Amino acid sequence: PNPVEAPETITTVGPDGSPAAWYTELELTPEELAQVRSMNLTACFELINASEWDNANLIGFQDACEAMNIKIVGQGCCDLDPIQQKTNMESFAALNPDIVTCQPQDLDVCAPTFDPLWQAGVKLTFMSNVPTGYTAGKEYVGAITDSIVDMGIDSAEMMADAIGGEGEILAITVADVNYVCNTRDDAFLKTIAEQYPNITVAEVGGFSSPNEAAQITSALLTKYPNVKGIFVSYSTPCIDVLQTVKALGRTDIKIVTMDLDTTCALDMAQGGNIVGIACDMPYAMGYGRALMAAYACIGKECPGYVTSPSFKVTRENLLEGYRTSLGIEAPADVQAALNG
């Protein structure tokens, strides 16, 4: 995707409260690139889940590694499970890589998962989340994220537009300590509370695992049958929420979520329940994680926290959303539904 210029004000801050750098600041000179290529580095990549969004992260990382002659020797997926993540990191450690990248889970207790890696000299770069107690440039190189506050604001604005600025809504959010999801969810709730006095969040349903979202939604819709909209933290649980809403025959409910996914996009294209998706640029974030690791491997000072753009996707700009967010054309069935 084409580079996006930094906004006048960057709203994202790192876990320590310091302002984030803009993602286009990450670059290597031709001489630095040649130096990295000559090192024959190796890397391991852990997916967060089996989503199109995370796959775009992986593709970005792979493309950057190819450009820098970094060989990917290990790959895993944690499905947001800190126990599985610990197992994956142990498997990665056995491969003796130079670089490991992932999104840490359950931040207050996950440091022991990563301690053996950095203590062995592995360069750690993270997606959005940082283990509690870790300092950039010490235990890890840096982390890259989306404009997480802006995504929450965008979601609130799309919800308000969809329900006419008034009525009851539900919010299905991440219950665990997850810096990026917690920040995005909180920004949504804060914007609704402060900017839309005629919209009431009837209840916030928190999930620890995405597969809990359907049951939570079903229970809350029984409790609050008059809700006009549902906000869902991100697209994976949103798929289950969407199926639940459809099974109940609630074609009237407007759903807003975050992160592009074909199931959600197809429903949007068909004029279904999903009316807004707050999006970011996962390909660019995957690419950036590889660059940050390369910085550390050649001793170049790296920003501790880096952010990248967010934007609203509705039915009107869905095709462009695919290009900007995932760096691909929308699937044929999504294109057909838009033209139908």
Predicted regions and their residues:
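Short, solvent-exposed amphipathic alpha-helices that sit
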Residues: W53-M68, M151-S155, Y179-I199, I216, ...
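Hydrophobic alpha-helical
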Residues: I99-Q119, F188, A202, G206-D267
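Flexible loop/hinge segments that line or gate small-molecule binding clefts
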Residues: L107-D108, P112-D150, E168, D261-Q270, ...
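Extracytoplasmic "Venus flytrap"
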Residues: I10-G60, A64, M68, V73-S91, ...
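Structural recognition of the beta-strand scaffold that forms the well-ordered cores
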Residues: A43-L47, D54, V73-Q75, I99-Q103, ...
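Hydrophobic alpha-helical segments within soluble ligand-binding/sensing domains
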Residues: L26-L28, A143-I169, T183, E212-A214, ...
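Short beta-strand elements in bilobed, periplasmic/extracellular small-molecule ligand-binding domains
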Residues: E66-D79, E168-A171, I192-P210
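Hinge/cleft segment of the Venus flytrap/periplasmic-binding protein
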Residues: N2-L41, I172, D176, V180, ...
